[in-house]
Amino acid sequence: NACAPMGEENAERVCAAAGKALGCRPEDVVVAATGVIGQTLNVAVIEQGMPELCGAAAHTAEGSDAAAHAIMTTDTVKKELAVETVIGGKTVRMGGIAKGSGMIHPNMGTMLCFLTTDCAISPEMIKSALLETVQVSFNRISVDGDTSTNDTCCVLANGLAGNPVITEKGPDYDAFVEALRALCVELAKKMASDGEGATHLITCTVTGARSEQSAETIAKSVIGSALTKAAIFGADANWGRVLCAMGYSGEDFDPDKVDVAFQSQAGSVQVCAKGRGLDFDEELAKKVLTEHDVTIAIAMGEGDGACTCWGCDLTYEYVKINGDYRT
């Protein structure tokens, strides 16, 4: 809340309006918001439109598609996905819609994600599953390094799949988490790919680190580096930007053991071995970096820790979008 007491009051008014229109308790309504920080919400407009909004809701694929479109702001593409798995001999379905293009650097940017499932699972277990999943999906993306005040990711389960209720960790819980993780990772990648003004999805893989946490810190530092992002935009294989971002990540590592390569559908180019630059084919490197999906592969040579994070390039369009975002 960035609007003092009025922010909380407005949220309660939205809950009351939604509860009345849907025939449920206001406390069963979750409010998610995006927009200019500190600018008060025009609740009267929402209250006026709530009956029509709720009346138009449809429990169909078309309804989900409409909702995915409705939450878009500076997004250029809608982000929705569905998966199926088998739990306890029953087919379980999960679906998700999300929005997020700028101010994406989640720490649970402005990102919103709404997940639904028909799995029968206890509140305690679904909370545990969501926490596990968010850590390895949405918390591993970055568009611009700015963490929003309003990050939201929620999951709703109605239990209609008919599987034995998941009340403890075990094979059924693991299957649920695996499906939820697959869903959220793909939604997270869609967000990174659709970063404001972005022309590239950047995947950074770190292997051979001292721990998974160390690998994550290094990978997030690289995808968050403005200079690395700008280099990818320009298809410039400037691997020094990568090592620089690794260095200021705060993690302790031996730079003389680091290997770096750029990869895409066009091929792979190793640019650094044991911390030293290599002679490489600049023309091939440019082809590799011209592809939409680009991977920065980093091998640390120090342990078994590994992590993958996702980001995007930094373009002129990003500056244009955010230079006059409020006006």
Language model regions located:
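A structural signal for small-residue-enriched, beta-sheet-centric alpha/beta enzyme cores
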Residues: 1-327
